Amino acid sequence: MSNLGFKKGDKVVIVGGGFAGLQLARTLIKADLKVILVDKQNHHQFQPLFYQIASGRLEPSSISFPFRKIFQRSKSVDFRMADITNILPDERKIMTAYDRTINYDHLIIATGCRTNFFGNKELSENCFSMKTTQESIDIRNKILFSFEKEIFARPEEKQAWMNIVIVGGGPTGVELSGAFAELKKDVLPKDYHNIDFSKFNIILCEGSKNTLNNMSEESKVSSRKYLEDMSVIVKTETILVSYDGNEAVLNNGEHIPTKNVIWAAGVTGNIIKGLADDDVIRNRYIVDRLNRLKRFDNIYALGDVAYMETPLYPNGHPQVANVAINQAKNLGKNILKSLKDDKSEAIDYEYHDLGMMATIGKHKAVVELPFIKLKGAIAWYIWMFLHLMLILSVRNKLVIFFNWAWSYLTKDTSLRIITNIDYKKEKVISLK
């Protein structure tokens, strides 16, 4: 189909300001459309660096970009801060959490993923997840505050504050484990002279046989070796069965006393109520090669929340940033073609895998590009360069580069700030 039905002056509502939603809004910034970008947060969050917020490497503002700042010079793109709770397709409206509606001519759903605890309520209530900037800050606060609590804890309680369990051996879990390991080695002993950090255990649990299980065998082996060289305890073929806030129970019967469990073991599509069950598979909207929902001619889904079958990917695309960004670019091109009444065929989306990468620590990284596989220092520099280039503003690029350079030269960071502690709730400084 050559024309998607977009007309000049149409109201296009994009729900979600992640990689896909933001990319589409920027693609349409000069189009003759009325574009409304809606998100629960007032800022775009650069998720690949959440772990550096959690480990005190970067300040939150360096990876957070206010939407109104991004589009302050645009006359066609506006922003609304709202949590969308329902889609009313027959009325062409979406409902917000405070019972207000937003009308649309065309709806693009780019709501990304949420943490998947696989229905385990106990884990969802007691584990930390890391899907927002605020959750990353919460992890930083809790981990740093644990050492303050350890000082006042009874002897039999101390080890629980010194064990961190990270569940999930994908890039997030591996990178977070490595970041905490560097803190353990280079930073924390200088801050806490009366704590024996040889008892500080970083325990990474992965359900499959390997860390970075979606990468090559060489990267799997290298990532585990890097982690174990940094004194991370790696437990593969290990599943967290239960966690009550005090003790983690593993599927091998092991019981680990811990006050800190971070869940990085899975995500699921963040769908919105209102569409039929037939429109969804595994919490992702079923779309055609143009990212359009099959039962609608004016509703689209992008990125992690879109399920598109292609000959190369019969089970849908991986839920990674590259897919989200390029689906948004492709849809943007097709929308612009439609506005010009271009009679040529709309462009089907085709995913081109650009590779995977993960960093474990200083000079310890693995990079897999379509034409080469790398590890060690050169991979680490490539990882830093590529992530730095993805940061939106020049100012933030400079801030992040300065922080990385300072950390590289001094093996230290000045961002170990604990905020928003409720002393009554925590019952922290008790000498009883």
What is each stretch, according to the model?
Residues V13-V15, N103-G112, L240, I256-G266, ...:
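Short hydrophobic core segments
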Residues M1-K11, V77-V165, I262:
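FAD-binding core/adjacent interface of flavoenzyme oxidoreductases
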Residues S2-R80, T85, P171-N214, I262:
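Beta1-alpha1 glycine-rich phosphate/pyrophosphate-binding loop at the start
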Residues K75-I87, A181-R289, R295:
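A Rossmann-like FAD-binding core segment of flavoenzymes
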Residues A160-M215, S222, I233-K235, P318-K337, ...:
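Rossmann-like dinucleotide-binding core of oxidoreductases
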Residues E125-E157, N246-E247, H255-N326:
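FAD-site-proximal beta/loop scaffold in flavoenzymes
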Residues G9, G332-K432:
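C-terminal, flexible cofactor-proximal segment of oxidoreductases
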